[in-house]
Amino acid sequence: MAEGVPASPSSGEGSRGPHSGVIQWLVDNFCICEECSVPRCLMYEIYVETCGQNTENQVNPATFGKLVRLVFPDLGTRRLGTRGSARYHYDGICIKKSSFFYAQYCYLIGEKRYHSGDAIAFEKSTNYNSIIQQEATCEDHSPMKTDPVGSPLSEFRRCPFLEQEQAKKYSCNMMAFLADEYCNYCRDILRNVEDLLTSFWKSLQQDTVMLMSLPDVCQLFKCYDVQLYKGIEDVLLHDFLEDVSIQYLKSVQLFSKKFKLWLLNALEGVPALLQISKLKEVTLFVKRLRRKTYLSNMAKTMRMVLKSKRRVSVLKSDLQAIINQGTLATSKKALASDRSGADELENNPEMKCLRNLISLLGTSTDLRVFLSCLSSHLQAFVFQTSRSKEEFTKLAASFQLRWNLLLTAVSKAMTLCHRDSFGSWHLFHLLLLEYMIHILQSCLEEEEEEEDMGTVKEMLPDDPTLGQPDQALFHSLNSSLSQACASPSMEPLGVMPTHMGQGRYPVGVSNMVLRILGFLVDTAMGNKLIQVLLEDETTESAVKLSLPMGQEALITLKDGQQFVIQISDVPQSSEDIYFRENNANV
C-alpha cells in the first residue's frame, strides 16, 4: 500500500473548531493515495475504539463523514464487494504505515473480508515492527483460519494499538507477555464452551439419546435449558441500561450466534424431536440477547441526548406544541375507535403516558426514570386489568397498536413542522417502541415457562416418594469395599457377562434393570468412569451411579439382597459387566 500526499484540512477554521481533535486524528493517520480505498464503516469503527469510554466528545457517523470530506475535499466514494456484502469505501485515501492503527486496520480488513486491493494479512502478534516487515510475505496467506464448526478464535481479535500505547507507559516486555497470556485465557474460555457442548452430546449412547427424545423428558430438560440461558444472560448483559462499549455489545451478539451454531453442530444426528426442542430454546436465548443489545445501544445514544440541555429543551417545547395545537387530530378517530362512547383523545391511556413522559424531559437525565414511567402505565392498563392469558394478549396488542399510532402521528408532525428536534424524537420514539416490545415479549416468555413447569409437575406421580431413589438403600462402597470383598463370606456366586450394545441388561437379580447412560473421563486424575442407571421394577425406584473402570461397587436392595457390580476395561467399544449376587449380610 503506497503512501501518497499527506492530508491537510482545506480550511484553517476547521482545525481550530470543536472537532479539531478528530481532524488532527485524520491527518495523523490517513493520507491521499490514488487507487486505494478505505471502508467507511471500518474507518469510523477504528475512530470509535480510539475514543474508548470517553464518549462525550465522540462525533456521530454523519459528522465524522463531513470531517473526512473537510480533510480530503476531493475524496470519491465507491461501493465495493460482492452482492449482498458490498460496502461503501472512501476512494483515494489510505492509512499510513506509520499510524498506530495500521496493524489493527490490516487485521480488521482481513477479519471482515472487506474488498481492498492492497489489503494484507495481519498475524496476531505483539511485535508490531515485524508485522510491517512481513507485509510482502503475508500477502498470499489467509488472515485467519476457521474450522468447519466455526471456531470462536477466528472472531477473537487483538487491539494492538491499545497494547502499544500501554507498552509505552509500562514495561514493553511485561505488557506483551501479559497481553498474550490474557488473550490466551479468553480464547481458552471460548474454546471450552464449544468443547463442553460437543463432548457432552457426542459422548451419549444411542439408547440415552432415544430416552432424551421422549416428549416428557424433553419437557423436563427444557426447564433446565431455561435456567442455563438465563444464567448466561445475567453474566453477559444483566441490565441493558449498563454503560458498556459498543464493541462489547457486538461481542455478546456474536457469542450468542456462535453458541447456537455450536449446539446445532453438536446435535447433528440426534432425533428430530430433540433437535426441535433444543433449537427452540436456544433461538429464544439469541432473540432475548438481541433485544437487550439493541436496547442497550439505543439507550447509550439516547443518554447522550438527555445530557444536552439544549436538545432536551427544544424537544420538549416541540412536543408540547404538537399536542397543544391539535396537530394530532388526524389520529383521534383511530385512537378512539376501540373505545365505548365518546372518550376524548386526551383521556386515552396512551396520551396520558405520552404526556407524563414529556413532563419528565428536562427534569431528569436518568433513562431509568422514563422507562419506569412507561412500565407503570403498562402495569396499570394491561397487566393489572387482565385476568387470563388470552385477555392479556388482547389488551397488550390493543395498547401496543394504539401506542404505535400515536407515536407515528407525532413523528409525522415532527417531520412537517419541527425538523430541528426530529432526530432526538426519532431516537426517543424507537427506544419507547422497543422497550414496550421487550416488556410484553418477556412477559409472554415467562408465562410460557411457568406453563412448562406446571406441565412437568403434572407429570409427577401423586406419591412424592414414588420414583425417588432411596440413597440409603442404594450405595457404593469405596475404601471399605476391598475389606468386605476380602472376607471369606463374600465369595461371588456367579458371573454373567453381557454385551453393552443393548439398552437393557439382565443382571442376575430378579426385577433389576441396568441401563448404560454414557462415559466420563476424570481429567484431573485420568480415571475413566461409566454412568449407569439401576432400576428396581418391584419398588419402582432408581439410582444413577458413576462407577470407575476395573473396580467394584456393592449394592444393597430393600429386601436385603446384595450384589457387586464390577466393570472391566476392555479394548474398543465393548465392556464386560459382571454381577455377583450374595445374600450374606455385611
Curated annotation (Swiss-Prot):
Spell out the subcellular localization from the entry. Answer: Nucleus
Q: InterPro entries annotated for this entry?
A: DNA-bd_RFX, RFX-like, WH-like_DNA-bd_sf, WH_DNA-bd_sf
Gene3D superfamilies this protein is in? Answer: Winged helix-like DNA-binding domain superfamily/Winged helix DNA-binding domain (1.10.10.10)
Q: Return one Gene Ontology term, BP aspect.
A: regulation of transcription by RNA polymerase II
Is Transcription among this UniProt entry's keywords? yes
Pfam families assigned to the protein according to its UniProt record, in alphabetical order: BCD_RFX (PF25340), RFX_DNA_binding (PF02257)
**Gene Ontology, cellular component aspect:** chromatin; nucleus
- Keyword entries, A-Z: DNA-binding, Nucleus, Transcription, Transcription regulation
Which residue ranges does the Swiss-Prot or TrEMBL entry mark as DNA-binding?
Answer: 22-97
GO MF, one annotated term:
DNA-binding transcription factor activity, RNA polymerase II-specific
UniProt similarity note: Belongs to the RFX family.
Function as written in the Swiss-Prot or TrEMBL entry: May be a transcription factor.
UniProt-recorded name of the protein: DNA-binding protein RFX8
Gene name per UniProt: RFX8
